[in-house]
Amino acid sequence: EPTSALDPEMVKEVLDTMVTLANDGMTMLVVTHEMGFAKEVANRVVFMDAGQIIESNTPANFFANPQHARTQLFLSQILR
């Protein structure tokens, strides 16, 4: 996770740099708990639980219509 060990003041700067790189066409595989970042930048969101992929979808579908109960629970707890 690229922002997990950063001071809060640095998180936005790092995420903004990653957004710029993505917009310039760079391919990235990012593990993150920053759901706003994933929603904005990702082409695909993959959700894992206990080391298993339980859901994979476009950001629009992942956030608007999660299919797996574990994904629904996770999103309900962080998107309040």
Please provide the spans of the model-predicted regions.
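H-loop/switch region of ABC-family ATPase nucleotide-binding domains
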Residues: 32-33
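ABC-family nucleotide-binding domains
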Residues: 7
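Walker B catalytic motif
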Residues: 1-2
